[in-house]
Amino acid sequence: MYTKHKWSSDVHYNFNYVKYLPKDFDANKKYPLVIFLHGAGERGDDLDLAMRHGYMKYVREGGKEYPFIFVGPQCPKDKYWGCYTESLLAFIDDICKTLPVDEKRIYLTGLSMGGTGTWMLAMADPDRFAAIAPICGSGIYWHGTVLANAKLPIFMYHGDCDDTVPFYESANMLRAINRHGHNNAKLKICYGVGHNAWDYAYTDDELLEWMLAQSK
């Protein structure tokens, strides 16, 4: 079951967001939380756009069911996730206060612009998340030590034929992290795939099983 909402704050930017609760949701039970950051093409004020890709696409179009709480905020038009780091962290805080979230199992993922946003948000507060999965995002190599020192589990996907965000962005990010002794980061190469590595990542059971197995 998914629903559309607006998050408001007196001191932070406001977001529209989509929320998914598992079948037979029990408010007395703790659930993993998956936070999804969409790409540049899904910005604006139409939440249907924010469900074009990723796990919510398969909930909406195919009736797929997942064992986690899902929230997908929507980035305003012509803006970038990097503009909203503090607001996103406050948003996550509120979600954890209002829903029965297992705070040892908070996962962050995103695609393209949202993949870059995933890197940025994780670097701002690496201890917040049990694992991250940046999909075809631009790397931030010079801050690789932050994630390496936090030993944050990371699973990347990238198409080797991506001409929008080149494959080397993820490859270089992996090298930057591993250079500092991180041993729980990996990159899955989608051979022959362009920018749409998300179509492979979010239908890959390996990613979901790996993510849900991570706990702080």
What feature does the model see in each segment?
Residues 35-37, 135, 190:
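Alpha/beta-hydrolase
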Residues 23-29, 76-113:
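Gly/Ser-rich "nucleophile elbow"/oxyanion-hole loop immediately N-terminal to the catalytic nucleophile
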Residues 66-68, 149-154:
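Short, proline-enriched alpha-helix->beta-strand connector loops that line the catalytic pocket
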Residues 1-33, 109-111, 116, 121, ...:
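A domain-start/cap signature at the N-terminus of enzymes
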Residues 47-62, 137-148, 168, 172:
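Alpha-helical scaffolding within the catalytic cores
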Residues 155-157, 161-216:
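C-terminal catalytic histidine-bearing segment of alpha/beta-hydrolase fold enzymes
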Residues 33, 37-89:
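Active-site machinery of serine-nucleophile hydrolases
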Residues 96-98, 104-149:
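Primarily recognizes the serine-hydrolase "nucleophile elbow" in alpha/beta-hydrolase
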